[in-house]
Structure formats: C-alpha cells, structure tokens
Amino acid sequence: MAQGEFALLRESLEPALQLSGQPIQRGTMAHEHTVCMMLVEAATMARDEAVLGRYAPKLEELAKRDGHLPYLGIAHRALGVAHRLAGELAEAEARLKQALELFQGMQAGWQVGRTLRELAELDLARSDRAAALGHFGRALEAFEALGAAPDAERTRQALAAIL
C-alpha cells in the first residue's frame, strides 16, 4: 500500500472511532474493534510505526475484552512489526510467535502465511538468511495451498531478493 493511499484510508477511518454507540442493526456501522483492525492492518502493510503504536495496543485491548481471537492475533502480529521497526527484536519475536500460535490454532492459513512472512522479515533484521528462507518458504506453501496468488507472488519476490 502506497503512503498516500494509507493516508487517505486513515483519514476516512479515524473519524469513525469518534462515533458513539454500537450499530442499531448488525452490519450497519463498523464496531470500534473493526475500525482499529483495519487501521492496524493498513499500518502494518505501510510499515507505519507511529500508527501501529497508537492502534495496535487498542486493538489488543478490544480483542481481549471481546474474546476475539482473530483480532488478537492481528494485534500480536502488528505489535511484532512495531517492535521490529523499533529494533526491539526479542519483543518482536515473542509477539509474532503469539500471533502464529493463535492463527495455527484457528487453522487460519492466510493469517499463518502473513505471520510467517513477518517472521522472515524479522530473520532478515537479524541477518539470519537461512531462517528467513525457511519462513518465506513456509509462507509461500501456505499461500499456494489457499490459492492466494497475490501473496504468493509477493513472497516469491521476497525469496528471489535474498537468493
């Protein structure tokens, strides 16, 4: 996601967090945790440390409150990325492993693949090319098993860049 696209998305979503109340009917308005999740996912893709620092802890809080395991996994992954961007590699690994465990337990293959990609990025930050190849390879397998062509292609490109 380009920085300009992320800025537009953020401009559109942040005001929704100021709205009070819950939807009158299911599906008529995004819940706070849904808006936070969208901001966190976009910030993760944009590698925006400031937005991750602002919304990932909130998403984690809301996911724990609501017992929403998919959003909790997304929050852990986002916090892992934020820690990696800040150079806090041990904290990043802990968060990414928490996310991976949650997603594997839910058999959420696409989320598993995305988390494995982030673990590969962490490996690269540690200059551990062999581990990165392993994580990218497992991510590629997950994406191919699902037919997630765009993610599989991005992963192939990442693999080619380090071969």
Give short role names for the model-derived ranges.
Residues 1-163:
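Helix-coil-helix junctions within alpha-helical repeat/solenoid scaffolds
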